[in-house]
């Protein structure tokens, strides 16, 4: 399980340090792709395979399903961690997430997210301000 918030910098070549606690879970390779809310999603190979099985069941006759799968897969990239504990994030993904210098890597249960510091701060401020309302709405999900 991924959890916690870690602040790192991304260098000019697009290399970002993966938190040590995450590296232990990720294995030899894992997948990073576009995420929602302007961040990137990272999955272990096992979690990616589970997600892939679900995505393959989406009906091709639904325009939104086709668009989502196309957008999600087209940016997916297999990553490997180098000897310094870094991954290289392709330019297209850096652009999607507005990754410049300061980044935040966040654990979110079965995946991790990579955010620009500015976007993360804006999201966290809004979520904190509305946390009670958000929590109240979670009752619909039996939490």
UniProtKB/Swiss-Prot annotation:
TM spans (from-to): none
Gene3D superfamilies: Transcriptional regulator MraZ domain
UniProt GO BP: negative regulation of DNA-templated transcription initiation
Keywords of the record: Cytoplasm, DNA-binding, Repeat, Transcription, Transcription regulation
Any one cellular-component term (Gene Ontology): cytoplasm
Top-level lineage group: Bacteria
Domain SpoVT-AbrB per the UniProt entry, residue ranges: 5-47, 76-119
Entries under PROSITE patterns matching the protein: SPOVT_ABRB
Subcellular location: Cytoplasm, Nucleoid
An example molecular function term from Gene Ontology annotations: transcription cis-regulatory region binding
Pfam families documented for this protein: MraZ
Quaternary structure note: Forms oligomers.
Matching NCBIfam families: division/cell wall cluster transcriptional repressor MraZ (TIGR00242)
Similarity-based family: Belongs to the MraZ family.
Protein name: Transcriptional regulator MraZ
Species: Ligilactobacillus salivarius (strain UCC118)
Organism lineage: Bacteria, Bacillati, Bacillota, Bacilli, Lactobacillales
């Amino acid at each position: 399980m991924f959890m916690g918030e870690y602040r790192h910098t991304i260098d000019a070549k697009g290399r970002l340090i993966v938190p040590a606690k995450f590296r232990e879970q990720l294995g030899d390779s894992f997948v990073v792709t576009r995420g929602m809310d302007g961040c990137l999603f990272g999955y272990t190979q096992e979690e990616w395979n589970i997600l892939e099985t679900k995505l393959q069941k989406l009906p091709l006759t639904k325009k939104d399903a086709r668009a989502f799968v196309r957008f999600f897969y087209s940016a997916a990239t297999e990553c490997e961690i180098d000897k310094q504990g870094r991954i290289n994030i392709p330019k297209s993904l850096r652009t999607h997430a507005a990754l410049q210098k300061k980044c935040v890597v966040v654990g979110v249960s079965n995946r991790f997210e990579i955010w620009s510091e500015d976007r993360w701060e804006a999201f966290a401020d809004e979520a904190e301000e509305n946390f009670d309302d958000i929590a109240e709405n979670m009752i619909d999900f039996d939490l």
